[in-house]
Amino acid sequence: MFPVAPKPQDSSQPSDRLMTEKQQEEAEWESINVLLMMHGLKPLSLVKRTDLKDLIIFDKQSSQRMRQNLKLLVEETSCQQNMIQELIETNQQLRNELQLEQSRAANQEQRANDLEQIMESVKSKIGELEDESLSRACHQQNKIKDLQKEQKTLQVKCQHYKKKRTEQEETIASLQMEVCRLKKEEEDRIVTQNRVFAYLCKRVPHTVLDRQLLCLIDYYESKIRKIHTQRQYKEDESQSEEENDYRNLDASPTYKGLLMSLQNQLKESKSKIDALSSEKLNLQKDLETRPTQHELRLYKQQVKKLEKALKKNVKLQELINHKKAEDTEKKDEPSKYNQQQALIDQRYFQVLCSINSIIHNPRAPVIIYKQTKGGVQNFNKDLVQDCGFEHLVPVIEMWADQLTSLKDLYKSLKTLSAELVPWLNLKKQDENEGIKVEDLLFIVDTMLEEVENKEKDSNMPHFQTLQAIVSHFQKLFDVPSLNGVYPRMNEVYTRLGEMNNAVRNLQELLELDSSSSLCVLVSTVGKLCRLINEDVNEQVMQVLGPEDLQSIIYKLEEHEEFFPAFQAFTNDLLEILEIDDLDAIVPAVKKLKVLSY
């Protein structure tokens, strides 16, 4: 569309006016071309032709309207370009803000994850510390129990050893007294031997025969002492029986009782007189069997002859031949055999004397001592005929029976201790080892201590109440058998310890008093959770703000309405400019603008 120039007229004034209008119109068209070129459009050209076939002619009003329309279009395109630029800038800002929010959200999420990991690690450490503390507490309690048991056992052992020490001290004192007594007896015996020997032989003993004679003297002196002791014992018994008889006489209320008691006393006195007469006869026989002075002189002469013969034999040993030596040996064999037999008899006699002294010791048991008395009375008649040691056999047999019965006593005490003290671990007695009285005393002492403790602890509940408590525990904690009671008690104890530790830690964290109840703890934890939730909401509101939230909602709604048109417009621009990226739109438009200039 090109406007046609008007035809020239004849008058000059109208021509001038037309020229000015033409120039003005051309200037307006030039300004419009400039605008079109600025916006990348092709300019319009004014032509001066007479041929009007290919031309469309507008009048002044239509050309003016055309110019106005073009101006409006150009202005609208510029406004749209500005609007697009603003939209691009706002889009970039929104992207930047979105990236910032995403980075903030990622940082917050990372921080929350880190805090969760830290909290989990702290929880695990707290659990480990609680387990360690529980295990240490259990270990310490077990140690304390073991130490208490050891202390009790040591106290028992200490008491036992104290008793043993006192017994040993008593035995040592008695042994010392016995040693002193034996020393004194030995000294007295040696003195009497030497005195009798000096009285008989008028010299000091220095040969083997003298020693044998001393042994013989000792033997007879011991028999004499024994007879004296028996006689004194019988006299004491007779005195005690007479006293008892007098007491019985005093106690008899009637005359018949007095007569009966007198008859009994007469019978007993007759029997005692007979016994004393028999003892007197025995003593007389014993005195008759003793050697006389004449026999002692003969013994001395024989000893002197034997000494001389021995001296001669020693001097003539090298000179006499083998046959004479054999003859002398044959002659000396009976005397040597007699000497050896005498020594053996002497040793046997000493052993029997020591056994007899042990049996007659006052420290011997009472029953055994009484039985030895009876044995002495029974063997009274044969004491002189034999050596007087026949009563030792039944006593030793009875002692052997008592020692064998110790095993039965040990078994019965063991069963009794299993009933009274089942936790006492008794050592298994070896069959080869003998049973000691100390072991039996230890068992009896432990049972007595247990009985005393039971008497002291009289407030202990009955067995039925304890059984009811155990059954109630089984019902409460679902324990089918008694074997599962201790594991379930340990489990309950550990759970209770964990709960107490957790409550204590919460009280320390919340700065509560240790005497505060669980209701107070639960209420404070609930308040803390509510405060934390309110703080989180306030922090979210502080970050985003209530007005920003509403504006973001409005912006999102506007963007939902605006983005489809903007997307279509940008796609058209990308196709026209032949580019693929939104960031390349602005540089391409700038290039076109430069090219248009």
UniProtKB/Swiss-Prot annotation:
Region described as Disordered: 1-23
InterPro entries assigned to the protein according to its UniProt record, in alphabetical order: CEP70, TPR_rpt
Keywords carried by this UniProt record: Coiled coil, Cytoplasm, Cytoskeleton, TPR repeat
GO function terms (MF aspect): gamma-tubulin binding; identical protein binding
Coiled-coil boundaries: 75-179, 254-326
Cellular compartment(s): Cytoplasm, Cytoskeleton, Microtubule organizing center, Centrosome
GO CC, alphabetical: centrosome; cytosol; microtubule organizing center
GO BP terms, alphabetized: cilium assembly; regulation of microtubule cytoskeleton organization
TPR repeat positions: 483-516
Organism superkingdom: Eukaryota
Annotated transmembrane regions: none
Main location: cytoplasm
Entry function: Plays a role in the organization of both preexisting and nascent microtubules in interphase cells. During mitosis, required for the organization and orientation of the mitotic spindle.
Domain notes: The coiled-coil domains may be important for tubulin-gamma-binding and hence for centrosomal localization.
Quaternary context: Directly interacts with tubulin-gamma; this interaction determines centrosomal localization.
Record protein name field: Centrosomal protein of 70 kDa
